[in-house]
Amino acid sequence: MDFEAVIGLEVHAELSTNTKIYCGCTTEFGGQPNTHVCPICLGLPGSLPQLNKRVVEYGIKAGLALNCSINKVCRMDRKNYFYPDCPKNYQITQDEVPICRDGYIEIELENGEKKKIGIERIHMEEDAGKLLHTNAGTLVDYNRAGVPLIEIVSRPDIRTPEEATKYLEKLKSILSSIEVSDCKMEQGSLRCDGNISVMPKGSEKFGVRSEIKNMNSFKALEKALSYEYDRHVEAVTKGEILEQETRRWDEANSVTVLMRSKEKANDYRYFPEGDLVTLNISDEWIEEVRKTIPELPHEKAERFVNEFGIPKYDAMVLTLTMDMAKFFEETALKSEDAKAASNWLMGDISRLMNEKAIEVKDLKFNPEQLAQLIKLINAGTISNNIGKKVLDDMFKSGKNPKDIVEEKGLVQNNDEGAILEVVKNIIENNPQSIEDFKNGKKRALGFLVGLVMKETKGKANPQIVNKLVSEEANKM
């Protein structure tokens, strides 16, 4: 029997506000433990929350960008549970009347087809503190308690781990582009839980689901869902009874591990938050927020294809982050060579950033300098290979490419006469390569070209070298 997965994602995004959701404490990441706290976020007796208006604005903004309907009347609710990281023993969240409903994200599948993944709801809530486990015991840091979150709950429309990854990538790019969250997964400002079950292909009855936590990267998300899918299929095939449960992804052993049986909504005893009034959102406020939404990543990608003529794949990669998209667009305009700008950013520059674990905003050079490098190559002043060496230097020092070329004497040699002398000398000293070429071994020419480039320390124009080597070899 063939099975398919039924997957839904719950994504928590920390909002980029300066202060917490119900008090004036800073939301800055880090700091000494328990220094970004006050009686309100610690839940001390007599303290009363006051809703941060910017949190509501960001909730509306996210909803509009994700094609949601905005609930003009919504309220906050208490979610009751006892855990050391929750100082009040309840979390202020939204239950029956969230700020947003009924949205969607459109992803593109491997075959080029587009698929809509429904968004059931978006609700505002406060984050919990953080538990720090040591050999001596468990410590609690409440700096994160009260940091504003939105939780984005998808419908169970996802059918493969790959689709789940595409959904999360698209969601991340949208939230970061509208600047409601920095979406730094490594710092926990974007966290994802997955719900998965399996059912026979063609069936409409969902199986028993598991919730998976601790998926803090795209790679972890895909691996965890794949593992859990295989575990469910194996159990169902053997006739075993699956139970609804919460599991965590163990990255070190590439398995999911049981945490607890899955709670149901009534376990949390939701009821309205009496210390906060019902929230009324006017049409005028919604329209004000709508005007602040910039060009979204998929819109920008479509424009890049039409305006710059780059491939669709390039445009999608370049718009995953707005910093990369901006860097590309400025470079393309200044260099007048969009494809070269795309190639450098997606190739060597991305490789160097990955090696150093930095982002576009951390680069020491700017789009104008990259455009200058592209122009030097296009003008024949330096070769593409020399350009890569110049880029390495730019990456380390931030110097202008022209200055690097002049300081290191990297100007390309375009003198055919001088290059011809080197070519003749190389051919004369490598008769076996000429013999191989005559016997049909085309690679022999590549070997000779390599020797010429080595002799000229990479400064000879590769096009001229290829032409002269071919001409001279055919004369022999």
UniProtKB/Swiss-Prot annotation:
SUPFAM superfamilies: GatB/YqeY motif, Glutamine synthetase/guanido kinase. Coiled coil: none annotated. Transmembrane segments: none annotated. It is an enzyme of class 6 (ligase). The keyword Nucleotide-binding applies. One of its GO terms (biological process) is glutaminyl-tRNAGln biosynthesis via transamidation. Keywords: ATP-binding, Ligase, Nucleotide-binding, Protein biosynthesis. InterPro entries: Asn/Gln-tRNA_amidoTrfase_suB/E (IPR017959), Asn/Gln-tRNA_Trfase_suB/E_cat (IPR006075), Asn/Gln_amidotransferase (IPR018027), Asn/Gln_tRNA_amidoTrase-B-like (IPR003789), GatB (IPR004413), GatB_C_1 (IPR042114), GatB_Yqey_C_2 (IPR023168), Gln-tRNA_amidoTrfase_suB_CS (IPR017958). SMART domains: GatB_Yqey (SM00845). Pfam families: GatB_N, GatB_Yqey. PANTHER family: GLUTAMYL-TRNA GLN AMIDOTRANSFERASE SUBUNIT B MITOCHONDRIAL AND PROKARYOTIC PET112-RELATED, GLUTAMYL-TRNA(GLN) AMIDOTRANSFERASE SUBUNIT B, MITOCHONDRIAL. Allows the formation of correctly charged Asn-tRNA(Asn) or Gln-tRNA(Gln) through the transamidation of misacylated Asp-tRNA(Asn) or Glu-tRNA(Gln) in organisms which lack either or both of asparaginyl-tRNA or glutaminyl-tRNA synthetases. The reaction takes place in the presence of glutamine and ATP through an activated phospho-Asp-tRNA(Asn) or phospho-Glu-tRNA(Gln). This is Aspartyl/glutamyl-tRNA(Asn/Gln) amidotransferase subunit B. It comes from Clostridium botulinum (strain Hall / ATCC 3502 / NCTC 13319 / Type A).
